[in-house]
Amino acid sequence: MQRMVILGATGSIGSSTLSVIESNPDAYSVYALVANTSVEKMLALCETHRPQIAHMVDGQAAKSLKQRLPTSLNVEITTGEDQLIDIVSASCVDSVMAAIVGAAGLVPTLAAVKAGKRVLLANKESLVMSGRLFIDEMRRSGARVLPVDSEHNAIYQALPESLQSNIGYCELEKAGVSHILLTGSGGPFLTSELASLASMTPAQACKHPNWSMGRKISVDSATMMNKGLEYIEARWLFNAADDQLKVVIHPQSVIHSMVQYLDGSVLAQLGNPDMRTPIAHCMAYPQRIQSGVEPLDFFKVGQLSFSEPDFNRFPCLALAMEACKQGQEATTVVNAANEISVQAFLENKIKFTDIAKVNEACLSQVAPQSLNSIEDIIRLDLQSRTYAAEWVKKI
């Protein structure tokens, strides 16, 4: 029986993880559920899954949950960063699903890595922000990190076992790998007139053609910043050079990514666009379990199409790739700026096309500096958020 902590339990990935657990009740149990402010959802999850601990990042939400949760459930309610670190580090915990969206997931995810846990990494921002610090800590502690993002999970499955067991330090060329091909659907605005993008609403941006996701990641998919962050994450996970990474537009979201080998072979992972598949793969690796996902029907799929990304349409993708070339400071800055600009768009404070403008303005201000600790990263993250917020006000 594998005991799990789910960071971001009330979100999309958290819900999918709990669904996989429900499909395999004899193999997994929930030790702790972690959320930010969603008291109603946490109440329901506690009643269904009976965790030992329910942790709310927001202190007021924790008080509300404590008042409303029946004592008969015998669930301990906690709040505070130190308590969260204790939860992911607990000796009884086998696996941690790291699914808190954004920079907020960095500290608990890194704490799980330091504790040597099996970390199912859905929080791409952790690697985007901390990069080498994260990878080195993983090697020091002996933590096993398994990528949950459908693209990175696909790449992982298409790599030889020798590279799967050496995440962060892969020698791609020695293993015969020539390129990693990251696929992306292009989002809801792939074929929209460029002139119309400025008038796109949050509701339109959040209407992804294939995937069911949260609002922030849905907007990131519409701008393709999500693919840019995944590009950075792939660089760290697979120790890939810029010339070994390519982005491919694939509107059907059936091929989740590919690995191209020196002999001309291309290995791809295919499946229906449902996050329960990569989640189940990570939970059970190296075994396979039921995910609850319908098998892919090739006759219904019919055709698969591919194209190069248009950087005029997707400037955020170009910015993220440029930040990756510049280094750790730049990726930390662009991630922070993007979180602020996307939130401003969702609140109707800026236009869809202003997201890239804010991100570019912040990236242009990156100054050389050393990021030698988590404190350095958090400080730069906060500085970048402040600068991005100022730009939002100017627009």
Swiss-Prot record:
**The protein, known as:** 1-deoxy-D-xylulose 5-phosphate reductoisomerase
Tell me which family the UniProt entry assigns to this protein.
Belongs to the DXR family.
Q: Name one Pfam family in it.
A: DXP_redisom_C
Please give the cofactor(s) recorded in the UniProt entry for this protein: Mg(2+); Mn(2+)
| Entry annotated with the keyword Coiled coil | no
Example GO molecular function: NADPH binding
Instruction: Name its GO BP terms in alphabetical order.
Output: isopentenyl diphosphate biosynthetic process, methylerythritol 4-phosphate pathway involved in terpenoid biosynthetic process
Per the database entry, which stretches of residues form a coiled coil? none
| The protein's Enzyme Commission number | 1.1.1.267
PANTHER family named in the record:
1-DEOXY-D-XYLULOSE 5-PHOSPHATE REDUCTOISOMERASE, 1-DEOXY-D-XYLULOSE 5-PHOSPHATE REDUCTOISOMERASE, CHLOROPLASTIC
Listed A to Z, the keywords are:
Isoprene biosynthesis, Manganese, Metal-binding, NADP, Oxidoreductase
Q: What does this protein do?
A: Catalyzes the NADPH-dependent rearrangement and reduction of 1-deoxy-D-xylulose-5-phosphate (DXP) to 2-C-methyl-D-erythritol 4-phosphate (MEP).
Q: What is the lineage of its organism?
A: Bacteria, Pseudomonadati, Pseudomonadota, Gammaproteobacteria, Alteromonadales
Keyword Manganese attached: yes
Q: Which reaction does it catalyse?
A: 2-C-methyl-D-erythritol 4-phosphate + NADP(+) = 1-deoxy-D-xylulose 5-phosphate + NADPH + H(+)
